[in-house]
Design a protein with these regions (language model features):
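Conserved hydrophobic beta-strand positions in leucine-rich repeat
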Residues: 97, 118-120, 143-150, 251, ...
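Sec-dependent bacterial lipoprotein signal peptides
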Residues: 1-16
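Leucine-rich repeat
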Residues: 93, 113-115, 139-144, 247, ...
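Tandem-repeat architecture and repeat-register "anchor" residues
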Residues: 50, 110, 201, 299, ...
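Canonical leucine-rich repeat
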Residues: 107, 128, 133, 296, ...
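N-terminal capping/linker segments that flank leucine-rich repeat
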Residues: 18-306, 311-313, 324, 519, ...
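Extracellular beta-strand/beta-solenoid scaffold signature
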Residues: 134, 292-294, 358, 399, ...
């Protein structure tokens, strides 16, 4: 036996003899099985924990990861703790945890995996923190989560459903994940003075759960045609929640007019009056200047056929994932941050999202979508376009590339004012598109020859150096591009030119436009394109017979002989 072994063994015996019988030494880097983050270290915490190994559990009060004297507790009974910091470590295997009514802001740790029951009612946990905790929770089937219904988000509900857990209200009643329920949540810190008018069409069995107990009480029938919602921040999280049970085919939300304001005299024409009038059309901001955000959970309101939210309501979160029959969804003018759409097989045909705050969006599974507007937003990427789409307006976003599938039925495409560097069409010919607006992007080379039926193309305000065009285009705008030359004449005698209107203004490098055979051309704008000389203009303008053409150009750019030649061809300036 070596001297080194004997020395280590002796040291181990010395360390062991120094420990008290009541102490259990853990490694210094051992993390708690469950860690609770607290809103305040000055307030006592009362919790109830269950464990199938009660002798090995303790609450670490001093943060040394050791079971010291006074840190044991009796499982199954409430224990009150005086925390010494803003975190509380729970050690040992636990089967249930009740922290209801406590100022807990976050729960984490591998010990969540073994829980079979958890009560989180009336805590300061955000819905996001609960969702994060549930990623580890619910590994064992048949567990129970006690939580207020208004805090049960679609993600929480789906996670619990996947692991066959139950969600229980504080009063002990079960929350049916399949019950038709509409939930509206207003996120606000202060009491609001504005109201929202909610209208429901085709309603059946509608009632408003005023006291949030999950049971229909005597005065909770929903008035015919809808109701006006006041939005006081009455809940502990600073939220206002309305839970509507029943079913309806149509839902609309509008800013409710104040009856007192309607009866009052109209304000005088002044800035103060204008500001007051404006306040009637938008929800009032919080005192700190932040806007009220509305969240709509219609994921279980499966009977909906249409939903519309008025511009200015500040709707931020919408979930219609369970509304497979939904045909029209109008949310324009609201800063949508999250949107959960129905899965594949839905009936959604019209989607209006102008002014949203989304960065990415997947609409590929919306196989029946025909109209989609998401202009003036923050989209950076959009997944492939569904083939049934007819109208697409994504102007005013941050898109850098887009591919149009060859089987698309798209007729109108508006991508104005994006950041496009790449724009492609799958396949050799695309017969559907009639209008293509690519103005205000970063495109340098474009091949649009596959758009064989496109009538209007606008590629203005691009650093464009080359372009291939369809032969039967009628209107073309290439203003503010870097093109040096453009050929609009038919490529062969089998074709003829259909172009009627050309805007080639402010093209600093443009020196030649071949258009002498474009006999249908009746409007040409060359203003600001000073590199294009007068003799080239007079020689290339087509001879008009049955039409009269209009040429827009600065005075003094054409000589008298050039002017005479142009007028002789049927053109006026």
């Amino acid at each position: 036996m070596s001297i080194r072994y004997l020395a280590c063994a002796s040291l181990g015996l010395m360390l062991t003899s120094c420990l008290k019988d009541s102490d259990i030494l853990f490694p210094k880097d051992l993390r708690p099985n469950i860690e609770l983050s607290l809103a305040s270290s000055q307030k006592d915490v009362t919790l109830t924990l269950m464990s199938d190994k009660p002798e090995s559990v303790f609450i670490d009060l001093n943060g040394n990861a050791q079971k010291d004297e006074g840190e044991s507790f009796e499982v199954g009974k409430p224990v009150t703790i005086h925390p010494k910091g803003d975190k509380l470590g729970l050690y040992g295997p636990f089967t249930s945890m009740d922290i209801s009514g406590q100022d807990v802001t976050k729960i984490s740790g591998k010990g969540l995996i073994g829980l079979e029951a958890m009560n989180l009612t009336n805590t300061k946990l955000s819905t996001q923190e609960i969702e994060d905790a549930l990623r580890l929770l619910a590994v064992k089937e048949g567990g129970k989560l006690t939580l207020e219904e208004w805090r049960v988000t679609p993600r929480i509900r789906e996670h619990i459903k996947f692991y066959k857990w139950q969600i229980v209200r504080p009063n002990g009643s079960l929350i049916d994940p399949n019950e038709s329920v509409l939930m509206l949540r207003a996120l606000a810190k202060e009491v609001l003075e504005k109201r929202v008018a909610l209208e429901l069409e085709g309603g059946k069995g509608l009632w408003l759960d005023k006291n949030l107990n999950g049971t229909k009480d005597a005065d909770e029938d929903l008035p015919t045609g809808g109701l006006t919602l006041n939005l006081p921040a009455s809940l502990p999280t600073g939220e206002s929640v309305y839970i509507i049970h029943g079913s309806a085919t149509g839902l609309s939300l509008n800013v409710a007019e104040d009856p007192a304001e309607d009866e009052s005299e109209e304000p005088e024409d002044s800035d103060e009056g204008a500001d007051e009038a404006e306040s009637t059309r938008a929800l009032r901001a919080n005192e700190d200047g932040s806007q009220i955000g509305i969240s709509i959970d219609a994921s279980r309101f499966s009977s909906l056929l249409s939903m519309e939210c008025e511009e200015g309501l500040n709707v931020k979160h919408v979930d219609v994932s369970g509304c497979k029959s939904l045909a029209t969804l109008t949310l324009s003018g609201n800063p949508i941050e999250t949107l959960v759409l129905p899965p594949n097989g839905s009936e959604l045909k019209v989607l209006q999202l102008a002014g949203n705050r989304l960065k990415t969006l997947d609409i590929l599974d919306l196989t029946k979508l025909s109209q989609f507007t998401a202009s003036n937003g923050t989209l950076e990427y959009i997944y492939s376009i569904p083939s049934e789409l007819i109208t697409l307006n994504l102007s005013g976003n941050k898109l850098t590339d887009l591919i149009i599938p060859s089987d698309s039925k798209l007729k109108t495409l508006n991508l104005k004012n994006n950041m496009l560097r790449n724009f492609k069409i799958e396949g050799e010919a695309y017969n559907g598109l009639e209008t293509c607006i690519l103005e205000g992007n970063q495109l340098e080379d474009l091949d649009l020859a596959a758009f064989v039926k496109t009538k209007l193309i606008n590629v203005s305000n691009n650093p464009l150096k080359s372009i291939e065009l369809p032969w039967d285009i009628k209107e073309l705008n290439i203003s503010k591009t870097e093109l040096q030359g453009l050929n609009l004449n038919p490529k062969d005698t089998a074709h003829k030119s259909f172009i009627q209107k050309l805007d080639a203004s402010n093209c600093a490098k443009l020196t030649l436009i071949q258009m002498s055979q474009c006999t249908n051309l009746s409007s040409v704008n060359l203003q600001g394109s000073k590199a294009l000389k007068g003799d080239k203009i007079s020689s290339e303008l087509p001879q008009l017979t049955n039409l009269k053409g209009k040429l827009t150009i600065e005075q003094g750019r054409l000589s008298a002989s050039e002017l005479s030649a142009i007028k002789a061809k049927g053109w006026s300036l």
